[in-house]
Amino acid sequence: MPQVDPDLFDRGQFQAELALKASPIAAFKKAIRRARDVLDERFRSGRDIRRLIEDRAWFVDNILQKAWDQFEWSEDADIALLAVGGYGRGELHPYSDIDLLILLDSDDHEVFREPIERFLTLLWDIGLEVGQSVRSVNECAQEGRADLTVITNLMESRTIAGPEHLRQRMLEVTSTEHMWPSKEFFLAKHAEQKKRHHKYNDTEYNLEPNVKGSPGGLRDIQTILWVARRQYGTLNLHALAGEGFLLGSENALLASSQEFLWKVRYALHMLAGRSEDRLLFDYQVRIAGLLGYEDNDAKLAIERFMQKYYRVVMSIAELSDLIIQHFEEVILSDDSGTPQPINSRFQLHDGYIEATHQNVFKRTPFAMIEIFVLMAQHPEIKGVRADTIRLLREHRHLINDEFRNDIRNTSLFIELFKCEIGIHRNLRRMNRYGILGLYLPEFGHIVGQMQHDLFHIYTVDAHTLNLIKHLRKLQYTEVSEKFPLASKIMGRLPKPELIYLAGLYHDIGKGRGGDHSELGAIDAQAFGARHHLPAWDTRLIVWLVSNHLVMSTTAQRKDLSDPQVIHDFAQFVGDEVHLDYLYVLTVADINATNPTLWNSWRASLLRQLYTETKRALRRGLENPVDREEQIRRTQTAALDILVRNGTDPDDVEQLWSALGDDYFLRHTAGDVAWHSDAILQQPADGGPLVLIKETTQREFEGGTQIFIYAPDQHDFFAVTVAAMDQLNLNIHDARIITSSSKFTLDTYIVLDHEGGSIGNNPERIQDIREGLTEALRNPDDYPTIIKRRVPRQLKHFAFAPQVTIHNDAQRPVTVLELLAPDRPGLLARIGKIFLEFDLSLQNAKIATLGERVEDVFFITDANNHPLSDPQLCRQLQDAIVKQLSVNSEPGNDLRISI
C-alpha cells in the first residue's frame, strides 16, 4: 500500500479542513467524493489494478483512522479497530464490503458502548457503509469455533487503530492449536466450495456469471489461500509458490487471472454504482468497451470479451482443481497404500491414477491421450493425482502436428469414443487440462466462445460436451422414460461412436464467420481422414454435421400434416440409418442448447416427423402418399367413429361439404370426429364454440389443443391471440380454416408459461374457455395489444426484425417467415397488421428460441389467393418491422419471391 499519495488523500489538507469546520462530516464527505473520482479516473486511464484496489484500501484506512481519532480513547485503552475479510487483505473495489471488527480485551462492552456508537454513527453520516462487529478476544474464540465464516474472516485481519497486541492475542486463541485444525478446515471449505459451485450450476459458463462466486471466480482463488493459510501460514500466491506448492508458471497464471477478474469487478461496481458481482447483460457490452475490446468481422466485442472471461475462469478452475487435489493428498491422505500398477506408464494410488515416473509424457507422449482412455476403461478411478495433472500441463506443449498425426494417438482418441462409459467425463477432463483443444485445434477455437443471445445458454465448447453427455444419458434406464424413442434408437445404432464424433464436430465451425455447419463439415472430413476412419463412417459424420439443424427446422417450421413435406424430408435423409442418427443428434442438441427449449410439444413434433418419415421410407420413396387418398382415409375413419356414437351420416356429410380439403389434411380422424360431434350439437345461436383437450400421442402429445368454431370475422385471429396472451398461454401451432359457409375452424396448440400442457385442471380449462368466448363475443371491446413491460434480459438482445415473403410452390398460399426479438403480445401485434392489410391467415408455426422468435405464417389475400403485388409485400414488411422493432430502425431485411 502507498505511504503517501496526496492526489488521493492529502492528510495535511484534510486536517486543515477539519479544523475549519464545526462538524467533521462535510470534510469527510468531500474527501470520499474526491477519492472516488480520482480512483475511477485512474481505472479508466489503465492504472495497474492491484495498485488500484490497494490504493482504495489505503484511502479507507486513512479515513477510518481520522474518524477514530475524532473520539477520545485513552492511551492504554484495550480497544482496537481491525479490518477483516477482503478489506483485511487490503483489497477494496468501489463498493466492496468494508468489514470492521472492533476488538476489546474485556467481555464487558459497556465502558466503550457510547464512543463506539458515536464512531459508527459518524461512519454512517459520512456515507461509509461498513459491516461491523464488536467482540472481545474471548468472544472471537467462541464465535470462530462455531462459525466457518467468522474464523475465515478473522484469519484475514489488520490493525487500523489501537494496540496491535489485541489482534495478536485474537490470532493466537483462534489458531489451529485451539480450533479448526487444517484437516477439519479443509473439509469444511471444500464442502462450502462444492455447495457454492452447485448454486451456479457447477459451470464456469453461465450467461450472466458471478465474478466472485461462480466456479473459477475470485472466491476459488480465495479458497486456495484460506486453506493454505490454515495449513502453512501462507499469506498470498507468491508465498505459496515460494513454499513449492505452486510452480512459477502457475503462480503467474493465477495472478494474471485474478487481476483480469479484478478489472471486471471494478468496472462492474463503477458502472452499477453499487456492490454488484453479477456480470449482467446490462453491463457486458459497456465493460467490453471499458477494457478495450472492439468488434471485428468474425466476433462482436462482447463475444471477444466474454470468451476471454470464460477462458480465464476455466484456467482458474483448472488450477483450483489441481491445488485442491494437492491439498487433499497432503492434508487427508495417510499415503499408506501401495500403488497398484496399471501398465508401465501408470499406476493407481489411493484410487487416483498417476504416472509411474516424471518422464512418462516426455518419453511416451501418446500417454497424454492414453491416460483418459484408461480412466474410461477403469471407471473405478476417482481422478488424476495432482503431480500427474502438473506433468500433463508441463508436457502439453509436445502436442504438435506430428503428435496429432501419430497413428498411436489417433487410434487412442477413437478408442475413447468406443468405451461403454466415461466418454463425456473424460472429454471434460481433456478440456479442463487443456489437452482437447491442443489435440483438436479447431476445438480449441471454440473454448469459451459465447453466443450473445438467450437461446444458447452455454459457450460452444460447454454445449458440445453437454450434447455428448445427453447422448450418453440416453442409454440410462431413468432417462429412457423421458426420451423413450431416442433411447430406443440410441441402443440400436450400429456404430454409436459415430454419433459422439458428429456431436463433437456439429458446432465446431462457430465463431469464424460464415455457415458453421459447412465449416464444421470441412473439419469433420479432415478429422476422418487423419483418424483413418472408413469412408462410410466419415461420410455419415460429415453429413450429420452439415445437416444437424435440418430436422429441428423442418419439425418447427413446416406443416407436418402435408404429405409432400414428409416425402421431401424422406428423400433428404434417404434411409432409416441416416434418419436414426439425425433424430438422436437433434434431440441431444436441443437439450444441450438450453434445457427450457425441450418441452412436450417440441418432442412430439420431432417424434411425428421421425415416425412419418420412417413410414414413408418403408413404403418406398417411389410410392408417396396421395393427398386425395389421405383425405378419404381420414374421412372414413372419422365417420366410423361418429356413426358408432349415433351421429346421423347425412348431417356429417352436409357439415363436411363446406370444410375443404385442407381441414382433413391437417387433422386426424379422431380430431375430425371430436370437432364434428361438438359442432353438430352446438345451437345455431350458441355463440363461439371453444373445445379444449390434451393432445394424444398420435396427435402431438404434450400440448393442449384448443379448437374454436365460430362465424368468421375479420379480426378473429388478432382477438384470439391477444386473449390467449392475456391468459398466459404460449401458442406453438395455429391451423386456421375458413369454411365455404363462412365459419372459422381454428386449432391452436398451446402450452402454459412454464412450457407444460394445461393438464387435467377443470378450473383452468373453464377460465380459458370463458376468456376466449368473452373476447370473441365482444371483439370491439377487447384490447388487441397486451401492454406489458419487456423483460430486462430481452432488452439487451434487440435486433432488426427480418421478414421473408415467398409463395409456396406446392400450395396456393404465401409464406411469411419472421425472425424477430421476442416481446409481450407479439402475435397480437402480427394479427393487428394482418387485419390492417386485409389478409387471411391459413396456418402458422410458432417457435420461441431464447430472446428471439422464428415464426412462419401461411397467408392469403381477401380473395384467398396468394399475394402477387411486390409493393404490397414491401409495405407489409415495413409495417411488421416497425411494429416489432425494440431499439432498431426498419432496415433492408426483406426478401420477396412472388
Curated annotation (Swiss-Prot):
Q: Which cofactor does it need?
A: Mg(2+)
Database matches in InterPro entries: ACT-like_dom_sf, ACT_dom, HD/PDEase_dom, HD_domain, NT_sf, PII_UdlTrfase/GS_AdlTrfase, Polymerase_NTP_transf_dom, UTase/UR
> What are the HD domain coordinates in residue numbering?
460-582
Any GO molecular function: [protein-PII] uridylyltransferase activity
Give the record's GO biological process terms.
regulation of nitrogen utilization
User: Domain named ACT: which ranges?
Assistant: 705-788, 815-891
User: Which family is this protein grouped under?
Assistant: Belongs to the GlnD family.
According to UniProt, the name of this protein is Bifunctional uridylyltransferase/uridylyl-removing enzyme
Native organism is: Pseudomonas syringae pv. syringae (strain B728a)
Lineage start: Bacteria, Pseudomonadati, Pseudomonadota, Gammaproteobacteria, Pseudomonadales
The coding gene here is glnD
